[in-house]
Regions:
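Ligand-binding clefts of soluble mixed alpha/beta catalytic domains
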Residues: 1-532
Length: 532
């Protein structure tokens, strides 16, 4: 009996259970009372609409924790007020964005705009169609200054509508509730639009504002309902009797879309790993600073648990190699967390990037680009090695080689944060700033400039205070720092696309590759100037 394995396993399962409880609360949206109110209007909720629309077992939700813990003074904004995910409709891959009208009548919070932009970014990067299920009261006015004016705010959504269309990426909108003010442009800038009778409406200004502005008295249905826009203005293309009829029309549209399957990347018949995926629970240490062998985790993820390791005996603090995940050919770059001994006899800390490991990883990333093989990054990194020996050995220039290779990579990159993601190590291992097609994190992960204890020591020193481990101020700094470094804070701010169950990592990678491989690679790989 492996006591340490069992302790790790119990702790990991506890973290996953806690995540699922949080998700259940998020899935409830604005609560039962608001859901009942939607049903009384003969409407479906955002999640009910998606469930009816997509193929069975073909929905992979993303960004569920968007806005988590934010806007509490306004009653919160579960899921960022909008439900989004990857789906299949009539066996055609797509992205879905659905306003949740149970959350402040579907009003746009700052996070709502950011989440919409992220989904559109995924669509542009991967050439995937988008379905918009519109049911929104418009901008949440109390926070308009955080939603309206900046480049990556509300207006960028409509700019992206135009860019998507120009690239031949199909967009369809269903207006299933209000669609007002600036938001009215979203469905109109889609390729096709559907409006539901009596519940759907589109206008730049509602009846109350029209009366106040020009004195005209007119009902919303006449102002911007289905009859007006399908028969008079010609703005919308299809009229639907109710939500299900609108969704059926989307299904019919997708049945006729000509989406060519991309053959750019190699995939064969999938085979399951020899190791159970749940074994990961016992490998992940309860204490995030403890050591483990990352190869054991890789073997729980890849087909037949087969992993061809590249330069196995060189640069050992980063593990590189080839494998298949659900049949897809991939390259894997992973931080090795166990302490290793180099061929020169040097003891090297796990999770730290040294010159030799940086050089190895940079070359491997380049080779994967040469072969057109997608790259999976498994991040558990505390940073680059410091000290006079490392500086004289060129750690900065060698680290820069890896950053350069990752930055210029043209193949799909998918990042999984499985533990620590600290400082420049986050950058070198394809953090958010380096355009991974998708970035996920396990519930135990930490994303910050440095660890909580190190940060607390630095802060205390800057404040010219001596610290003791039982000092309340010292402990408070660590607690606050760790909270801000948590996976939940990262997900709330959309620094990551999803917090995933570690045992479901293989499925998350496969779904990401399915999306990423929709777009052919036409560019050639080229690095910039490198210091040698």
């Amino acid at each position: 009996m492996d006591l340490k394995f069992n302790i790790n396993e119990d702790y990991s399962k506890l973290l996953v259970s806690d995540m699922k409880k949080k998700l259940d609360k998020i899935y409830a949206g604005g609560g039962k009372e608001k859901i009942d109110k939607v049903h009384k209007k003969n409407k479906l909720t955002a999640r009910e609409r998606i469930e009816y629309l997509v193929d069975n077992d073909a929905y992979f939700e993303i960004a569920e924790f968007a806005g988590y813990g934010k806007y509490e003074e306004f009653g919160g904004c579960p899921c960022g007020g909008v439900v989004a995910g990857i789906a299949s409709i009539n066996k055609k891959l797509c992205l879905i964005i659905a306003n949740d009208s149970t959350v402040k009548s579907g009003a746009w919070f700052p996070t709502t705009a950011k989440k919409n932009l992220r989904v559109q970014e995924i669509a542009i990067e991967n050439h995937v169609p988008i379905v918009y299920l519109v049911d929104s009261a418009g901008v949440f006015l109390q926070l308009q200054d955080q939603i309206f004016p900046d480049k990556e705010n509300f207006g960028r959504v409509f700019r992206n509508n135009a860019i998507l269309s120009s690239k031949g990426i199909f967009q369809v909108s269903a207006i299933m509730g209000p669609c007002v003010a600036g938001g009215a442009y979203l469905p109109i800038m889609s390729d096709e639009s559907i409006i539901v009778e009596k519940t759907g409406s589109i206008f730049l200004a509602g009846s109350h504002l029209v009366k106040a502005a020009i004195g005209e008295i007119v009902e919303n249905e006449e102002l911007g309902g289905a009859k007006t826009h399908c028969e008079i203005s010609g703005i919308t293309d299809y009229k639907a009797m109710d939500d299900k009829d609108a969704l059926d029309k989307i299904k019919s549209i997708f049945e006729k879309i000509n989406l060519k399957e991309n053959k750019s990347f190699d995939r064969i018949k999938s085979e399951m790993p020899l190791h159970e995926s749940s074994k990961i629970y016992g490998i992940i240490p309860k204490e995030i600073k403890d050591n483990y062998d990352v190869v054991e985790i890789i073997k729980c993820i890849v087909d037949k648990s087969e992993f061809l390791e590249y330069k196995k005996d060189y640069g050992k603090t980063i593990v590189c190699g080839y494998a298949r995940v659900d049949g897809w050919s991939v390259g894997i770059v992973a931080n090795q967390r166990k302490i290793i001994k180099s061929s020169t006899g040097e003891m090297q800390f796990g999770g730290v990037i040294y010159s030799d490991s940086a050089n190895k990883a940079a070359r491997f990333v380049s080779i994967c680009n040469q072969k057109k093989i997608p790259i999976i990054f498994l991040q558990d990194v505390t940073g680059f090695m410091v000290g006079s020996k490392s500086e004289k050995g060129g750690i900065i220039k060698n680290g820069a080689k890896l950053v350069n290779a990752v930055s210029n990579s043209i193949v799909p990159k998918i990042t999984i944060i499985i533990g620590n993601s600290y400082g420049a190590g986050n950058y070198a291992m394809c953090g958010k700033a380096y355009d991974p097609r998708f970035i996920f994190a396990w519930p135990n992960s930490k994303i910050a400039v440095m660890g909580g204890e190190q940060a607390a020591k630095v802060i205390m020193q800057l404040n010219k205070k001596a610290y003791k481990k039982d000092d309340p101020e010292y402990r408070e700094i660590i607690e606050n720092y760790n909270k801000s470094a948590s996976a939940y804070n990262a997900a709330s701010n959309l620094w990551i696309d999803k917090i995933i169950d570690p045992a479901k990592t293989r499925e998350a990678i496969s779904k990401s590759l399915e999306v990423s491989c929709m777009k052919e690679i036409n560019e050639s790989y080229s690095n910039g100037v490198m210091q040698t």
